[in-house]
């Protein structure tokens, strides 16, 4: 594999995604497209009680469908980060060094997520990722 140039200056970004409105506990998929191919999680926000999981690829997200929340994912499953929001504290700071990297082939500037909600009333979730992009170009 040849040398892959990084971006000139790593930069902080924030990307927000809003789910569809649902009326019962739900599992919803999100895709972030402005966070580059590789970076570091600085903070993640969610405005409702939910469990959010980030993945290296859509395939990893699909393979994780049946995993119970109380169970850790297998090693090398493509699960990057699991966060539980209580609906009271809207922002969580992942452990220092929590990184993401797109694991698809061909490489794409995508970060995949799944949000699991437990509310029995109409709700939509706003999920926000603050990140430090370290690599944002896709080799041609």
Protein language model regions, located:
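Terminal beta-strand-rich extracellular "head" domains
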Residues: 53-96
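Short linear motifs in intrinsically disordered/low-complexity regions
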Residues: 9, 30, 39, 48, ...
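Beta-sandwich interaction modules
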Residues: 31-33, 78-112, 116
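Beta-rich globular "head" domains
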Residues: 14-18, 23-62, 134
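C-terminal interaction-tip segments
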Residues: 4-24, 105-110, 114-140
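Intrinsically disordered, low-complexity regions enriched in small/polar residues
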Residues: 5, 34, 43, 53-57, ...
């Amino acid at each position: 594999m040849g040398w892959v140039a990084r971006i000139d200056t790593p930069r902080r970004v924030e990307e927000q995604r809003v789910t569809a409105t649902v009326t019962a506990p739900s599992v919803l998929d999100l895709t972030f497209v402005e966070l580059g191919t590789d970076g570091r999680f600085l903070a993640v926000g969610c405005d409702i009680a939910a469990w959010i999981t980030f993945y290296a690829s859509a395939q990893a997200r699909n393979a994780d469908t049946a995993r119970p929340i109380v169970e850790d994912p297998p090693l090398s499953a493509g699960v990057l980060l699991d966060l539980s929001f209580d609906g009271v504290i809207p922002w969580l700071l992942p452990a220092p060094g929590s990184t993401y990297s797109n694991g698809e082939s061909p490489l794409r500037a995508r970060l995949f997520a799944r949000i699991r909600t437990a509310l029995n009333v109409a709700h939509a979730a706003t999920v926000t990722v603050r990140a430090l992009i370290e690599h944002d170009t896709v080799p041609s």
